[in-house]
Amino acid sequence: MKATQVFGVMLLVLAVGCGPVEEPSNPPEESGRTAVQALEDGNGLAFNGLAFNGLAFNGLAFNGLAFNGLSSASFSTWFQQHPAESNLFMKYLVHCAVPAGQTRTYSAGTATYVWSGGLGLAPGWSHGSPATLEEQQVVSACLGALVNKYGRTVQISVLGTTAQGRPIPATASELGSFTIREGCFFGNLFNGEGLFVGNDQGVLPPAQSSLRACALSGGNACPPLVHVGSCHGRCRFDLTGTYFAQCTFNGVTYHSLTTRLRPEEIYTCGDGICQPSESCGTGNRPDSCNRDCGSCG
């Protein structure tokens, strides 16, 4: 299982309705790969890392984007406003929505951008149809599940179904390795309802931390993701009890995705290693971990 580098990228809001993504540039493939494999493959990108990079969230929203295809004037206008951020966002969006083995291409002047598919969660939208409500929700959940607050490499397991109800493949080996039940992710970025996260197991105790801070840290760890408490109070399991199939918030029921971690992704202040989620200080908490990171100054 190879590791990949996480890029810090701003998660942008899709502020208007969604028309079709342009037709596939490659024939569709049926893939039996697990989500872990799909998350690790492709161009050295770690699609398990949508890290917020501090840019103005509202200022980089999809203003005026009708999404009538990647060749439309509206898409070009949106993309060229912030091409670097838009390019990174599209890599994650296409990875979530489009099946593995397909790419989406956009050209602007002498520059050509190619984005690879991965999880294939929105098959209708991927093949040119307007995004259904279910597709909007599951792609939003995917983007939320890929958030990594610290922009570092973290291998995760994503469980759930596509918009059409097809389970994301997961092997017994994957479930046996990724034993930390992290969280549930749901919402709708496309219509402005927002993006929500809950913790599956209990939140981490005061001395522990993780690069995957959004679910297990609780509170306001990853704005604009809104932490809604325990998944168990808002979500229902699938028939097998493996993952949360739906979650309800503010009277709206969403298609959700569930994530799992490996035990080694949880760090404890005092283990002698100063982790990216820890900092210097005089205490024994991650934000002031003297034993691992020393005193400041």
Regions found by a protein language model. Give the residues of each.
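Long, compositionally biased low-complexity segments
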Residues: 68-266
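Bacterial N-terminal signal peptides that target proteins for export
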Residues: 1-8
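Bacterial lipoprotein signal-peptidase II cleavage site
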Residues: 19-25
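C-terminal motif of bacterial Sec signal peptides marking the signal peptidase cleavage site
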Residues: 14-17
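Post-signal peptide N-terminal segment of mature Sec-exported envelope proteins
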Residues: 26-49
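Cysteine-rich modules of extracellular adhesion/ECM and protease-associated proteins
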Residues: 267-297
